[in-house]
Each structure stands twice: as C-alpha cells, then as structure tokens.
Amino acid sequence: MTSTPKPLVLIILDGFGHSESPEYNAIFAANTPVYDRLRATQPHGLISGSGMDVGLPDGQMGNSEVGHMNLGAGRVVYQDFTRVTKAIRDGEFFENPVLTGAVDKAASAGKAVHILGLLSDGGVHSHQDHLIAMAELAAQRGAEKIYLHAFLDGRDTPPRSAQSSIELLDATFAKLGKGRIASLIGRYYAMDRDNRWDRVSAAYNLIVDSAAEYTADSALAGLQAAYAREENDEFVKATRIGEAVKVEDGDAVIFMNFRADRARELSRAFVEPDFNEFPRARLPKLAAYIGLTQYSAKIPAPAAFAPSSLDNVLGEYLAKNGKTQLRIAETEKYAHVTFFFSGGREEPFEGEERILIPSPKVATYDLQPEMNAPEVTDRIVEAIEQQRFDVIVVNYANGDMVGHTGVFEAAVKAVEALDSCVGRIVEALGKVGGEALITADHGNVEQMEDECTGQAHTAHTSEPVPFIYVGKRKVTVREGGVLADVAPTMLKLLGLEKPAEMTGTSILVDA
C-alpha cells in the first residue's frame, strides 16, 4: 500500500461500555443519532477491556490507565496490580528490598511506619489486600508504631461501602497486636489529580500534623459520623482517629497505591524541597518516602516495584516510520492519552504534538456534563482540515468522569454531548477522505445504578466496549478482539508491518 487515507483518528470514549440491559443505561437512554447511524452502516463489534484480556486478575474491571496502556502497547500489559498481588502470594513482597529497607530504618530507631493508601477492594488505584500485606511486613520486621492513613473510595466501589474494608483492617491490626487506623479522609481530597491543591493540603495536614475537622474514637465511628453528615466515602472530610498521630523526623512513609496519576500530588508535597503549591506547616525529615510503584520520574521517591519498559509501542513505532501524530485530551485524561498510551513515557516522540484542553473547574462533573468536549472537538476538526498529522489520538473524558458522579440525568447529557462531537469528527474526516476507529478503554456510563444495593453505580464495569471502523474500506470486524489489538489494527490501516513486540492482531479483516 503506497498511500493511506489521512488522517487516521483513534477516538477513545472513556468509560463507554456496552450493556444489553437498558436499565439505568445512559447510552441507551440518550439521543445518539450519530452513534446509531455508525452502528447501522459501518463495520462494528465489541472488544474486551477487562480482566485477563488487559493483564488484570480474572474478572477485574478495567480502568483508564490499564486501558490506555493496552491500547498503545499493542500487547497485553501485565499490570502493577497483578505484579504486586503475585509478589504477595509468592512471598517476594515481604523480601522487597525497598520496602524492608524503609521499615528497618524506621523500626531500628523506634520510629513509626505510616502506610498511606486507598482502602478499597476496587482494584483500580489500590487494593486493601496490599495494605494488609504492608502492615504485616512492618510488624514482622519489628516496627511497633504502625499507622494507616486510610483514603476512602466510593468511586470505584459503591458510594457507601467502606465499612467492610475498615472492619477488615481493624481485624488485621488486632491480629498483629500492633498498629491502628490513625486517620480517614475521602479520595476527593487525598487523590486529586487536577491541581486542586486546597484538597491535597487537607490530606497532607491531616497525615503530617493530625489537623482534622473531625475526630472519632474509632474508624467505624468516624465513618458513621461522616455518613450522618451526608458525606459518602469519596467525600469524607479529614477525620482524626483516636489520639493524634503526627509524622515525625525519622519516620517512614509508604504510599500503597499502585496507580500513579492520583498519587502524584500528595507525594510531591512530601518529597519536593521547593514545593510551593500550598504552604506546608511542617516538612518532616523522613527515613524514607516510598511509592509502591513509580509515580513519576520527576518525583524523588524510590519505587518498591520499578516500571518495566515497553519497546515499540504505537507512538514510538509511528515515529520510527516517519509518521506524525497528535495526542489530545482535556486535563482529566491528558496523562492517559500521553504517558499511559506511550507505555509510561513522559516525553513526546519525534513528530508527536500534544494539545491539552483544561477541564472545567467545577466541584463535580455532573454540573457540566459536556465538560470541555466541544473545545477538544474544535481542535481535532482543525487538525483534520489541515491534514498535518498521519494519526490523531483523542480521549473524551465525559463517559467516565460524569459516570463516576452516579447522576443518571447528567450521564445521559454527557453521552449526547459525545455523540455530537463524534459526528463533527466523522463529518470532517469525510471531507478529506480520512478514517477513524471508535472504541473505549473500559465501561462505566452504561450502568448507573447498582442492581444489588439500589445505590448509584459510580464504578467502572467489566462490560465489553464498542469498536467501530469509519471509512470506505470493505472490511469486517472479527470476534474476540481485545484492547491490545487496536494498535495492530491501526498499523494495518496505515500500511505498516507490526513490530515483533506487538502480539495483538488486527480486529479488521478484509471482506
């Protein structure tokens, strides 16, 4: 193939899964003339974005980080969740030199080990089993002061589901005969990723100085008091549990989230000497600050599980073959369409340009369900018309970010906004003879109520995701595709042989 249609646009509809059930399905309820027309007239099917198909444990729902890694890598990427869980099972976790070194340094001086992390069985940013293993490791190595600073979920889990996790950790500490939960705060504060530093400062001050709006005798009592204030898990305000615990000089702090994007801001507050995003009342001289994984090459903190390198991911391979590419998203998903899609690489490849559209500054995205998708689309249409790029990769955050709010009516509006944006891209491509692949990284917005509890469903799902080809070729969509097959499909459309490292295979078959 000597020339290929230009550009090829990969449209990633974040959190946009496929469910046969119409119940509380925002996609089913929305008015989507473009999506309906494409499914009626273009080759389409479903591909898997969860579990073993994306390198997660069997049955585990997909997520944005994992989805974009697989989409860009063209192979199944075994995730940090899986790596850490396996290390715990095999016993290697308890011999990890980064973790044991940090604990030993603090314990030998009679200092405390502070464990930070999302206390959840959601498996998206963390897993409570990993926090339990860390408490066990600290106790085994002689630490007497072990404190868990628990961030509550309610986003990748039901909105009020923290009680069982707290009970599990309380039981763990009782069994160990040492350690306790020292503080509670919702992930809304501790795990911001959009430079809302007022939220992060609340978490930092709680952990470091035990500065809290509320106090409680036990973690369960603190949780029940938050529920009485109408705060779901995600939004629980800073709560000190029992006697005040401060992070002192010589203590070790270990952040047990395995996913990077929502661990960066709080980590920066602990380790950056010239940090100026908010005034730190105190910066303890720690024996160690450890991340379970590498949160960023720019954050000076050792990682217990260092990143494994991925060679010949789509972006790198396009650059090697002289192709130009554009990556575009709004703030909430910018890291996904750049860092994660590039296999954990921060810098652009040669011939790669990036456009970041700031996400709207609203408390929660149900207040502006269209987010800034129209502005993202303006820039894509402009790039298509200019025909400067061979490949454009775009992420639309709406399905996921509005899906996470649990507000059904807002989710319907988000889907309708997406439909309009996709229509504009398809129209622009038609004028220049370009092509598109439309897919998603995981499900979310197609299930907005938990059938078992009747609560709002704010988490991701394990549903398959759509895959639609937009263009003039005579092709069909094969069954059994996974996210790792998308990059090889794109290379086929571009007339490029896939590299040996890509084990995925094209989803499109010549008709």
From Swiss-Prot:
GO terms for biological process: glucose catabolic process; glycolytic process. Its EC number is 5.4.2.12. GO terms for molecular function: manganese ion binding; phosphoglycerate mutase activity. It catalyses: (2R)-2-phosphoglycerate = (2R)-3-phosphoglycerate. SUPFAM superfamilies: 2,3-Bisphosphoglycerate-independent phosphoglycerate mutase, substrate-binding domain (SSF64158), Alkaline phosphatase-like (SSF53649). The gene is gpmI. This is 2,3-bisphosphoglycerate-independent phosphoglycerate mutase. Its cofactor is Mn(2+). Belongs to the BPG-independent phosphoglycerate mutase family.
